[in-house]
Amino acid sequence: MLKEFREFAMKGNVVDLAVGVIIGGAFGAIVTSLVGDIIMPIIGAITGGLDFSNYFIPLAKSVTATNLADAKKQGAVLAYGSFLTLTLNFFIVAFVLFMVIRGMNKLKRRQEAAPAAPPKPSAEVELLTEIRDLLKKA
């Protein structure tokens, strides 16, 4: 049973999937940092120093806090600022994946478009061609 599991785990598709999941997780952390630490502060500076991560609508009358963390402790809130940040994060990931797949498709098309060299004629065909050429000369 251990041998069968080892064979299954070492198949190309399983290993490729594992590598993809690990790289995807690392890429997700990079994109999250890009959105939260670079893009959203720039957008906040353009819009007058607004911090989108703290935007919320209180859904309970007991919520009086001005920041999201305290507001969540006081009651139900609709944290639309966090949603905007995560939505931007999603679109960046989707765009990067689109560009990667687009590049891979272009490479595939180039490889498919390259015409294959015609196969070398067999020895019989070469011999018959020589005979034909000699008969034409005679």
From Swiss-Prot:
Gene3D superfamilies: Large-conductance mechanosensitive channel, MscL, domain 1 (1.10.1200.120). It is a multi-pass membrane protein. InterPro entries: Mechanosensitive_channel_CS (IPR019823), MS_channel (IPR001185), MSC/AndL (IPR037673), MscL_channel (IPR036019). The chain crosses the membrane at residues 19-39, 40-60, 81-101. GO terms for cellular component: plasma membrane. One of its GO terms (molecular function) is mechanosensitive monoatomic ion channel activity. Keywords: Cell inner membrane, Cell membrane, Ion channel, Ion transport, Membrane, Transmembrane, Transmembrane helix, Transport. It is found in: Cell inner membrane. It comes from the Bacteria. Channel that opens in response to stretch forces in the membrane lipid bilayer. May participate in the regulation of osmotic pressure changes within the cell. Homopentamer. Belongs to the MscL family. This is Large-conductance mechanosensitive channel. It comes from Bradyrhizobium sp. (strain ORS 278).
